[in-house]
Amino acid sequence: VLIVQKQIPRFKFNSIISALSLVCYLIGFSFSYLTVDTGIGALILFGGSMVVMFASALFLQEKIPLTRFIGVFISLLGLFILVNPGFSENSLFGVALMFLASFGWGLYSVLGSRQKNPLSNTAGNFIIALIIIIPIAFIIPDKVETNYYGFFLAIFSGSVTSGLGYSLWYWVLPKINITTASTAQLTVPLIAAFGGYLFIWESLNWQFYIAAILILGGISLPVFYKR
């Protein structure tokens, strides 16, 4: 895509910070779920990144209407119902890693709100992150069995879906408020659940429908009522 548009990856100081935050997200997310329940992990990831983005918005003196705070609370309640986290014993180290992931993703999103060239900036961030990750991959003791199919899916997921998805995210971020972006992220687990229903025939229970109403309602509230 960069070649077609005659662009090149951009490398700036912000690219290093963005890449480091991306690495924090990648490592924290990947290793946390080895010891942390899915529901708890989702709550920490999306809730934590929302806190980081809201705190950044306050620091940058972004005007936040009361309805947006109320909408966030309603959406978080919907997320809680959707993931239905159990309160079983989770590894404290795994929980800490997920907090690291939430901080990394929140910071990556905040930095993206000030980018003007989403595609080339994302490419630069990915290249720097790859340079950081490769040495870490050799340090971490882990035996991983791979095959050609898994290798292909990893390449496709990283270069196509993640690359284009993150570029789109960086394109959207400068056009909306940071707090609006943080709340909009809560649709991700909702979309994932619906995708499971469409593509792998997972069932949708009452929790999904209630969560959908709360999450979408919470996101819509500050759009229609801006006070």
Question: Model-found features: residue ranges?
Answer:
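Transmembrane alpha-helical segments that form core, pore/gating elements
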Residues: V1, V52-F54, F87-I140, L168
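Specific transmembrane alpha-helical segments of multi-pass solute transporters/efflux pumps
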Residues: V4-L45, I74, I81, G158-I176
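Hydrophobic transmembrane alpha-helices of multi-pass small-molecule transport proteins
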Residues: V1, L22, I64-N84, I133-I134, ...
